[in-house]
C-alpha cells in the first residue's frame, strides 16, 4: 500500500536513547541522507566488555548531516552525545540542548518543543525547505534566538 508514496532516495534514520545508538549504527548506510539522534550518543567506555558493540569508530564512517537533540546536562546520555559531537569532523553536525532531562517532553501533546525542531530538520534535509533551514542556520536562526536552547554546530553553512 505504500508503493509510490515513499522516496527511497530521501532516507532519514532517527532514534531516542538506545534507539539513537541503533540509528547511529545504521547511519553510515549509503541510503541515509540524514540522521537525527534524540537523547543519545555512542557510549564512552574504556573496555571492550560492553554488550553494546558499536563504538566511537562508527562516527568516522558518517557521510551525511547529523543532528543531536539532547536534554541538557541532566540527560543521562549528555556526555555520550557531547563526546560524539566533539569527534565528528567529516560531516555537518548540529547539537541542540534543551534542559529537560533524558525523556525530554515527549509525553506532552504533539511531542512538546522537541517535535517541531525535529520536523524542521527533516523538512530542511529531505525536502530542501529554506524556512526550515532558518531554524538552524543564519544570523537570526530560530533556535539561536531562543534562550531555552543551547546550539552548537559545525559545517552547517555548507549545506543547501
Question: Where do the model's predicted regions map?
Answer:
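Gly/Ser-rich "nucleophile elbow"/oxyanion-hole loop immediately N-terminal to the catalytic nucleophile
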Residues: 1-21
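Divalent metal-coordination and catalytic microenvironments
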Residues: 11, 95, 122
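Extracytoplasmic low-complexity repetitive segments enriched in small/polar residues
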Residues: 13, 64-68, 117, 128
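Solvent-exposed, acidic/flexible segments
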Residues: 16, 28, 59, 108-115
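Hydrolases whose catalytic domains are alpha/beta-hydrolase-1, hotdog thioesterase
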Residues: 22-26
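Sec/Tat-exported extracytoplasmic proteins
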Residues: 30, 39, 125-126
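The feature captures the conserved acid-bearing segment of alpha/beta-hydrolase catalytic domains
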Residues: 33-108
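Alpha/beta-hydrolase-fold serine-hydrolase catalytic core, especially in secreted/extracellular enzymes
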Residues: 91, 100-103, 108-160
Amino acid at each position: 500500500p505504500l508503493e509510490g508514496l515513499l522516496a527511497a532516495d530521501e532516507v532519514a534514520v532517527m532514534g531516542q536513547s538506545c534507539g539513537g545508538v541503533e540509528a547511529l549504527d545504521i547511519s553510515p548506510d549509503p541510503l541515509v541522507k540524514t540522521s537525527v539522534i534524540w537523547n543519545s550518543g555512542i557510549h564512552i567506555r574504556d573496555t571492550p566488555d560492553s554488550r553494546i558493540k558499536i563504538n566511537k569508530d562508527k562516527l568516522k564512517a558518517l557521510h551525511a548531516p547529523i543532528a543531536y537533540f539532547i536534554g541538557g546536562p541532566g540527560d543521562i546520555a549528555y556526555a555520550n552525545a557531547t563526546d560524539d559531537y566533539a569527534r565528528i569532523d567529516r560531516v555537518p553536525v548540529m547539537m541542540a540542548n534543551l534542559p529537560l532531562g533524558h525523556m525530554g517532553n515527549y509525553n506532552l501533546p504533539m511531542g512538546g518543543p522537541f517535535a517541531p525542531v525535529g520536523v524542521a530538520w527533516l523538512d530542511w534535509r529531505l525536502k530542501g525547505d529554506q524556512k526550515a533551514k532558518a531554524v538552524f542556520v543564519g544570523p537570526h536562526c530560530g533556535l539561536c534566538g531562543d534562550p531555552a536552547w543551547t546550539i552548537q554546530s559545525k559545517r552547517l553553512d555548507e549545506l543547501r
